[in-house]
Curated annotation (Swiss-Prot):
Protein name: Carbamoyl phosphate synthase large chain
Catalytic activity: hydrogencarbonate + L-glutamine + 2 ATP + H2O = carbamoyl phosphate + L-glutamate + 2 ADP + phosphate + 2 H(+)
Residues engaged in binding Mg(2+) 2: E299, N301
Lineage: Bacteria, Bacillati, Actinomycetota, Actinomycetes, Micrococcales
Region (Allosteric domain): 951-1096
Binding residues for ATP 2: R712, R754, L756, E761, G786, I787, H788, S789, Q829, E841
Binding positions (ATP 1): R129, R169, G175, G176, E208, I210, E215, G241, V242, H243, Q285, E299
SUPFAM superfamilies registered for this protein in UniProt: Carbamoyl phosphate synthetase, large subunit connection domain, Glutathione synthetase ATP-binding domain-like, Methylglyoxal synthase-like, PreATP-grasp domain
UniProt binding sites for Mn(2+) 3: Q829, E841
Amino acid sequence: MPKRDDINSVLVIGSGPIVIGQAAEFDYSGTQACRVLREEGVRVILVNSNPATIMTDPGFADATYIEPITSEVLEKIIIKERPDAVLPTLGGQTALNAAIRLDELGILAKHGVELIGAKVEAIQKGEDRQLFKDLVIESGADVARSHVAKTLEQAVEFAEDLGYPLVIRPSFTMGGLGSGFAHTRQELERMVADGLQSSPTTEVLLEESILGWKEYELELMRDTADNTVVVCSIENVDPVGVHTGDSITVAPALTLTDREYQHMRDIGIDIIRRVGVDTGGCNIQFAVDPADGRLIVIEMNPRVSRSSALASKATGFPIAKIAAKLAIGYRLDEIPNDITKVTPASFEPTLDYVVVKVPRFAFEKFPAADAELTTTMKSVGEAMAIGRNYSTALQKALRSLEKRGSSFHWGPESRSVDELLETSRTPTDGRIVTVQQALRAGATAEQVFDATKIDPWFIDQIVLINEVADAVRDADELDAETLREAKDHGFSDAQIAEIRGLVEQEVRDARHAADIRPVYKTVDTCAGEFPALTPYHYSSYDSETEIVPSDRRKVIILGSGPNRIGQGIEFDYSCVHASFALADAGYETIMINCNPETVSTDYDTSDRLYFEPLTLEDVLEIVHVEQQAGELVGVVVQLGGQTALGLAKGLEAAGVPILGTSPSAIDLAEERGLFSGILDTAGLVAPRNGTAVAIDEAVVVAEGIGYPVLVRPSYVLGGRGMEIVFDTATLHDYFLRMADQGIIGEGKPLLIDRFLDDAIEIDIDAIYDGTELYVGGVMEHIEEAGIHSGDSSCTLPPVTLGRGQIQQVVDAARAIAEGVGVRGLLNVQFAIGAGVLYVLEANPRASRTVPFVSKALGIPLAKAASLVMVGTSIAELKASGLLPERDGSDVPMDSPVAVKEAVLPFKRFRTKDGLIVDSVLGPEMRSTGEVMGIDRDFPRAFAKSQEAAFGGLPLSGTVFVSVADRDKRSIVLPVLRLQQLGFEVLATAGTAEILSRNGIQARVVRKYSEEPAAGDSPSIVDLINRDEVDVVINTPSGRTARADGYEIRAAAVAADKALFTTIAQLTAAVASFDAIRAGFDVTSLQDYAIAREARR
């Protein structure tokens, strides 16, 4: 049937901040939905708390609300905007749970708003573990033996029936949060307690163990006429026991017989019908026992999921876009295929290639965490690759991770076969490389299967890769036949060079001399049956290319690769905006990226998309083919984070024009000695500092500066490897760890700075065109210096800096931009201590705050910067209206205040003892995402940011206080205010004594480490675990920051308590309590823009 005429406006609920298990794929889904709904003439109202998303740009919705995703806020938006319907199926678990809550509270019925995309009954059937289990059994399909428990006592009782080990799965959670395998009653009790806490319905499923079974997924879509398509089958290379988000996956499924696949397909279609998903998509997971072929259904997601984004990129079938159309009444056969233009969406995609996804982990950020992979998702990103066979796709995906040791290698291996096999028994990041090394060392495929339960077919493919490597090594010369064989199995020039004992350029020269270059094939959804009209390409060493020549001037934009802590969706935001701006300016835009989660890898974001690894070899080959197909103006490297910047020198050396800031200028900012010269010339001050490439040098520099010092490697993002070091012994230990990781050495010096304690940190984002500096925004960090800027909350405009100080910051940034030779974006970090402005670092590239600044002040920084890179002046951008005349350094007094807050993943990472890793913040970034609060003043904006990031602050109850000696003076006023607000105060003995002297009565509780006296009260950890504490204030003392109070902080995180580890954050929170009690107003970005124009 045609589009429904009774739906004229739709409220789309986004997924909120990037967290493990719910990442950039929902920005991709939501952006697609907003686009298609507006194309259909539907008024779109969007709510999302994440400013780093493309979907929250005002151009993608008619009313855009960057607000907390809570029932109260959603009702206010509904009252204000009067939507006809709410679409929750494209915003992950966050949106789905929010929609169910609106229904339960009667808010939808009260305001006459319909839920579209999935009915509440369908959501309940798909998400409620018991309902779904009953439904699968009714269909005649099989499930694992299981029980649903709502209490710990029930769980213990059911475990006796099921036996150990068993699986715990909470209801209505995402990314496997709170799930796991329990081998003992002690593990069961801990995991069930976590699971009940994580589940919004307080229930967990206890399931018989299916460890080691093969795992599969189907992506399905269904419309109101009961047309159902299976978009894609996905197979997990890792067996059951590893969360699918942490497993290497392959599409299409490769080890199923046709009969098995058809059986799985029939079950999937029957389930989607019984659940009642009839206006959208769903994902169903299956397991197959390799011993006897028994097939069971594990679970389903009655919404667009993480796997949906992967399936969309793998097939070219835009699941989110089609789901949005189905939600407003279309049938599948009424929706044309964007890629072919002649086939409808009711045609199932067909693949004539193989797609492999490999997860990206960040265990280096959490050294105390247990790195074993389980049913709780721990990866922070993923890379995807497309190849004509599995070995090519796998090798391309592994090198897309950009991690040392992540690709197969053939250098010396010190471990024995037995050691390698034993290591491979435990699923960890990089297990696939351990398997390759074990096979290379002489292990049989059978031994590897016994150790890992990875299907023998996948093991045989690694055997084949090793055989090809042997042939490359043993060849008399590196001839065309040998090279082509290696390339047909995905070997990079660097791998071939390692095997042959050559340098990479020698292999490249030999390959080019033999005229062996990749060709580029097209993702077309139909295995070549119909012509593809969207240029979405992948490389192959076949004979025929599918690149169409063009007479337009081209610009290549390098993306940022897989998400990781320190380099996430914020950089993709800048790449996407550059593509839009350059296309509007008449350039043909070419995107290179390998991240399936992002908007940049949508086939209609750029004129041409290459889904390829971001390595020098892969990028140079694309540059070559594009130069053959027309005029290439240059390559943009300053938007894709350190990934793209790291390729700048190699590209320039190969004669490729780099747009914007030159590689030599980038070096000026990164190389400490050169940058110090620029600061001296400009009369600017940096903290006392030095560099070292050897440990003896480092000790001399550190002792000359005086401890504590801040140490960090060069050329890294997200503060990787950054630490505060208090003595020489710690410096020795630090240096050895960094050197082992290969991030300190010749050409990569260690940077050593005086640590500025009690300083205010400031960020500025700006654009420089060689003549004029245009300030995007000046941000003041709420936490003191020493906490990474990516983890610190910040406010825009600043709330404690005077106009004179802001002007001083702007003047310093201008001098740095001129001295470095910036053309495009510049981010500079400063600190003000004892009245002195210090320059901490300058980055001549996009920063992670660009989206926040753009949303807070309505300045399209990334678009403007991309045009400056191709020669447009800031004066011309002002004249065109793209940039406002008044820049972000001059914010009117009555402007709204925006606060950015970081979201941290501590709850995902536990030690081997089961404790959550320490949540103390420091100079190494550990946040996965961010939220924004915006309102008329700082207290209200901060309150919104806390609501969006952590679910809000309690307005009454019990507060526990235990702080380091240095903070005892600062703690008095905030705690006094909390007591005045009605909080009962608990404290450890030392802190309670200080509070008492200042007129604050506190009940003394013992520390976790103190022995209880006879008849003594419970420890603070016991009280937190009993839910008798609402707010925890615990600041660690400097030298023992990682240990002091750790148990207290771990308990607070596990119990989802409000936790403050800095006085600055606490002070801001206390100031916001009155704002929270008064309630929030909601204002769209479009309304803020109208008010901004009126002020100009």
